[in-house]
Amino acid sequence: MNIVENEICIRTLIDDDFPLMLKWLTDERVLEFYGGRDKKYTLESLKKHYTEPWEDEVFRVIIEYNNVPIGYGQIYKMYDELYTDYHYPKTDEIVYGMDQFIGEPNYWSKGIGTRYIKLIFEFLKKERNANAVILDPHKNNPRAIRAYQKSGFRIIEDLPEHELHEGKKEDCYLMEYRYDDNATNVKAMKYLIEHYFDNFKVDSIEIIGSGYDSVAYLVNNEYIFKTKFSTNKKKGYAKEKAIYNFLNTNLETNVKIPNIEYSYISDELSILGYKEIKGTFLTPEIYSTMSEEEQNLLKRDIASFLRQMHGLDYTDISECTIDNKQNVLEEYILLRETIYNDLTDIEKDYIESFMERLNATTVFEGKKCLCHNDFSCNHLLLDGNNRLTGIIDFGDSGIIDEYCDFIYLLEDSEEEIGTNFGEDILRMYGNIDIEKAKEYQDIVEEYYPIETIVYGIKNIKQEFIENGRKEIYKRTYKD
């Protein structure tokens, strides 16, 4: 093996490396985490150990940084005995295990291990078509665990008394990196649920939906568990939980909303769990099959729910206020401070034209109230009689412009029912300026490509930046 990227080189272990390996593996700072300080290697015993035959394919490598050897790694294809040892089910998938150490303490905590692991991921996918990679760090080695998590590994199981280390059986984690669904790894989510919620046993789990920064799972065919992994995960789920609690206390309606039974909220991880609300999600296709009477009853259900929610005294959750216009102004500043100068004249013209419209409009000066703020068909559940029975996903909710809950109801698209549907609901809702609601919807729609670019900047996702820029061109030349 010979992989070179910038300062890092990963090459095959050779005989000339063993004196340096002996130096590393007689350093107690290294042995504390790799091998154990009770190991007493000689050059001969070290050579024997690190050249012994392997059951299947193995790569033994030296890690170099700026041409200086600083560590060792081994990557091996899993075989029967290892599957049993790791408690990892054997399937037709191609799975590799790995372990490694940085033998020069001066190079610890510099991100080199993380970069090394990502290069190995790339190699195993490209050269071996691997499906997954696993490893089993000691639980008492938090520095290594953090590095593995930064690389993409996720904890999927506890391995109690798994590895003999300095005369004691050490507890370990089984960590996995998957090439197909790593961000949504159901085994990792199963582990998190059982780890953070005592006495909750996961018998079945499946992904039922995902957004830009969150994933939802159906667990035991009864509960919905959501996890958020963006930079605002703690604030986002704390707010969402508070709003669910507020609504369940104050709303007087037969329409169900999530009632949080399980929550874990921290800077590192946030999870919410609630019993699934049964029903069928509203779609344009379902709506088109309904009788006129059923359609009108559904529109009245929606208007009634929104009118009641928008009329609640929100004093107790006033900290959940969202200023859409101010947010856009701040995002414009972020654009100016980051990639604005790299944009084309067409892209800049689109942005500046939008900002002129934003500063001229009065639609942001209307009523503020508690809104869902993502009130679209795929969040509305119907019962067997096509009546509104449930509303989910209040993750974007807050005290905001009244018009925002009509954005999707007024939208003409494959996912939404159309402008006439939204206008009918607005008329049933009453005491609202329908033309201003439509203007608000149009402004939000015009902002969409800019919002996409900003999301990419905030979350360091280049594909969103590129998609937003492409959308500006599509809209500019649509005629």
From Swiss-Prot:
<dbReference type="GO" id="GO:0016410">
    <property type="term" value="F:N-acyltransferase activity"/>
</dbReference>
<protein>
    <recommendedName>
        <fullName>Bifunctional AAC/APH</fullName>
        <ecNumber>2.3.1.-</ecNumber>
        <ecNumber>2.7.1.190</ecNumber>
    </recommendedName>
</protein>
<dbReference type="InterPro" id="IPR016181">
    <property type="entry name" value="Acyl_CoA_acyltransferase"/>
</dbReference>
<feature type="active site" description="Proton acceptor; for phosphotransferase activity">
    <location>
        <position position="374"/>
    </location>
</feature>
<comment type="function">
    <text>Involved in resistance to gentamicin, tobramycin, and kanamycin. Tobramycin and kanamycin resistance is due to the ACC activity, specified by N-terminal region. The C-terminal region is a kinase that phosphorylates several 4,6-disubstituted aminoglycosides.</text>
</comment>
<dbReference type="GO" id="GO:0046677">
    <property type="term" value="P:response to antibiotic"/>
</dbReference>
<keyword id="KW-0046">Antibiotic resistance</keyword>
<keyword id="KW-0012">Acyltransferase</keyword>
<dbReference type="InterPro" id="IPR000182">
    <property type="entry name" value="GNAT_dom"/>
</dbReference>
<dbReference type="GO" id="GO:0005737">
    <property type="term" value="C:cytoplasm"/>
</dbReference>
<keyword id="KW-0814">Transposable element</keyword>
<dbReference type="Pfam" id="PF13523">
    <property type="entry name" value="Acetyltransf_8"/>
</dbReference>
<keyword id="KW-0418">Kinase</keyword>
<comment type="similarity">
    <text>In the C-terminal section; belongs to the aminoglycoside phosphotransferase family.</text>
</comment>
<feature type="binding site">
    <location>
        <position position="393"/>
    </location>
    <ligand>
        <name>a gentamycin</name>
    </ligand>
</feature>
<keyword id="KW-0511">Multifunctional enzyme</keyword>
<keyword id="KW-0614">Plasmid</keyword>
<dbReference type="InterPro" id="IPR002575">
    <property type="entry name" value="Aminoglycoside_PTrfase"/>
</dbReference>
<dbReference type="Pfam" id="PF01636">
    <property type="entry name" value="APH"/>
</dbReference>
<feature type="domain" description="N-acetyltransferase">
    <location>
        <begin position="8"/>
        <end position="180"/>
    </location>
</feature>
<feature type="region of interest" description="Acetyl-CoA binding site">
    <location>
        <begin position="110"/>
        <end position="153"/>
    </location>
</feature>
<keyword id="KW-0808">Transferase</keyword>
<keyword id="KW-0067">ATP-binding</keyword>
<dbReference type="InterPro" id="IPR011009">
    <property type="entry name" value="Kinase-like_dom_sf"/>
</dbReference>
<dbReference type="GO" id="GO:0034071">
    <property type="term" value="F:aminoglycoside phosphotransferase activity"/>
</dbReference>
<keyword id="KW-0963">Cytoplasm</keyword>
<keyword id="KW-0547">Nucleotide-binding</keyword>
<dbReference type="GO" id="GO:0005524">
    <property type="term" value="F:ATP binding"/>
</dbReference>
